[in-house]
């Protein structure tokens, strides 16, 4: 997988968690079965944290967050073969993501998934981190396992100290 790094679209992902230690997930318009955490591409010249905050505002409609940390490494995933020609005109075989852990500092009313007028998600909820993988589409499950493994102890420590 990593031997073709130029075939992976640079992207950021955001694990946004609330005071109870639950993560934000949204149900995409193109699926009735799968939920995902916010993510999106990095624009040319854009810093990774700046991209993560922009994507969060675009997809979740809030900036009431505290950036806690980011993943130590890029996390790669491949798209299914049948999806590659559809996504980004076949330019990429998958995505390489840097994940950011952010604590939500607002109230649920501060979340507006319709913020941009062209939402990514049709609904959203807070979900326990232990069940995030089960809600994800198959080709993102390993990514979610890696992100949870890296961030779960930080989330637990943060919710205890809140």
Curated annotation (Swiss-Prot):
Q: Which Pfam families match?
A: NUDIX (PF00293)
Q: Which cofactor does it need?
A: a divalent metal cation
Name the GO terms of the biological process aspect.
nucleoside phosphate metabolic process; ribose phosphate metabolic process
Top-level EC class as recorded in UniProt:
hydrolase
Hydrolase is among the record's keywords = yes
The chain positions of domain Nudix hydrolase read 7-149
Q: Which UniProt keywords apply?
A: Hydrolase
Q: What is its EC number?
A: 3.6.1.-
GO molecular-function terms, A-Z:
bis(5'-adenosyl)-pentaphosphatase activity; guanosine-3',5'-bis(diphosphate) 3'-diphosphatase activity
- Where do transmembrane segments lie in this chain? none
Record has Transmembrane helix as a keyword? no
> What InterPro entries does the entry give?
Nudix_hydrolase, NUDIX_hydrolase-like_dom_sf, NUDIX_hydrolase_CS, NUDIX_hydrolase_dom, RppH
Motif Nudix box: residue span? 40-61
Sorted alphabetically, which HAMAP family does this protein's record hold? Nudix_RppH (MF_00298)
The similarity annotation says: Belongs to the Nudix hydrolase family. RppH subfamily.
- Stated role: Accelerates the degradation of transcripts by removing pyrophosphate from the 5'-end of triphosphorylated RNA, leading to a more labile monophosphorylated state that can stimulate subsequent ribonuclease cleavage.
Name of this chain's protein:
RNA pyrophosphohydrolase
Look up and give the organism this protein is from: Wolbachia sp. subsp. Drosophila simulans (strain wRi)
Q: Which gene encodes it?
A: rppH
